[in-house]
Amino acid sequence: MAAVSSVASLRGADYENGLRGGAGPSGGGQDPGEDDPMGRGTLDLDLELLTQGRRNRRVGGRTAPGRRSGGRGGSGGGAGGLEELEDEELEEEEPGELTGDQTIEDPELEAIKARVREMEEEAEKLKELQNEVEKQMNMSPPPGNAGPVIMSVEEKMEADARSIYVGNVDYGATAEELEAHFHGCGSVNRVTILCDKFTGHPKGFAYIEFSDKESVRTSLALDESLFRGRQIKVVPKRTNRPGISTTDRGFPRARYRARASSYSSRSRFYSGYTPRPRGRVYRGRARATSWYTPY
């Protein structure tokens, strides 16, 4: 609106100057409509002012140098001004003209970004692998590698009823060889070769556990059979109980020796010694007691 007001004021001033200069042949002036009957000079001025106003609004105060000439004297000045205005608008609308090289991406920067993305992906994969390893470590071990299972007394007795004791086993024998030797008796669940806990050497005997009790009775037929050049001893396994030896098969081992035997040995050794019996003999209703000598 300011540009239109300035154009109107300029046109009024030009008109007054033309009237003052003489409006006829006597005045010596020139009619503004003689050389330019269409008033194109004024139109060129108007277009130039309008173009300047639009430039200031679009570019924010920037004015392209060398494009102000609107062609005041020629008849094609107005059309030239419009063409320049359209060209300038097209140039302003093209992206990246004002920013220059800033819109062009740096290949080195792209390579760095790609490397960072690869490192992040590798870190994610390593984290997943670590989580899987932790899960596997927290899981219970497989049955084949499990440690000794604590069994109840009933379970132990039931397993012992399906097991046999094999004595006089060669020290170089393996569990596979023993399993092959008793394979015809039935399905073998487990073969245990006892070793010394200090030296790690075999003790010379083993235990074989079968799937059923019938296999135990069948395996007794291999008693005194030859295994690796030795005559082995095969007997049913017994549950370990207090006071029963695990090596002396079938012969219980008392915790304490009888005092009578020790006394008798001493009596034989010392002829004048008479042992004192532990029992008492009651006779009738008498309160008095008397010691007796069994020998």
UniProtKB/Swiss-Prot annotation:
Specify whether RNA-binding is a keyword of the entry: yes
Q: Where is the composition biased (Gly residues)?
A: 19-31, 71-81
**RRM domain: which residues?**
162-239
Q: What is its main location?
A: nucleus
GO CC annotations?
cytoplasm; nuclear inclusion body; nucleus; ribonucleoprotein complex
What top-level branch of life does the organism fall under? Eukaryota
Protein name according to UniProt: Polyadenylate-binding protein 2-B
